[in-house]
């Protein structure tokens, strides 16, 4: 009987939080097999292995303190915000933005970098109800709309009389954006 424990996860932070050592990422199309005696086998299972990462992993699903495919999720999100800010400067040099507000939570790092690059204040304009889950993966449209209404509560002081740039991680289903617009 093997005396070792094994864990396999898509994010490094899971392994770290459970006290496991990160060994390596699996290659595209690679399978990992652990038999009943604890022996590990790696096998290429695809005829045409190709890395095709899901954009939502780094942008939305992954925790910012994770490494995925040897890329820091936190650093990736900071770079996205910086690049968006540079695009704003390039395409709209006379921009008038008083405040940058992230839609909680995963857009926070991008909003931080964007605000810093633009030289604009970063503010928390929404308080998130921690008991409402991810709204875009809820089963029906009615359920999603109801949950979005309950999910974000605006800090009206941060919106009143200001040109606000809202930063979100992605637009999968735009109910959150509609709610954010209604409240501001």
Q: Regions from the language model: what does each represent?
A:
Residues 107-108, 177:
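Generic non-transmembrane alpha-helix signal with a bias for helix starts/N-cap capping motifs
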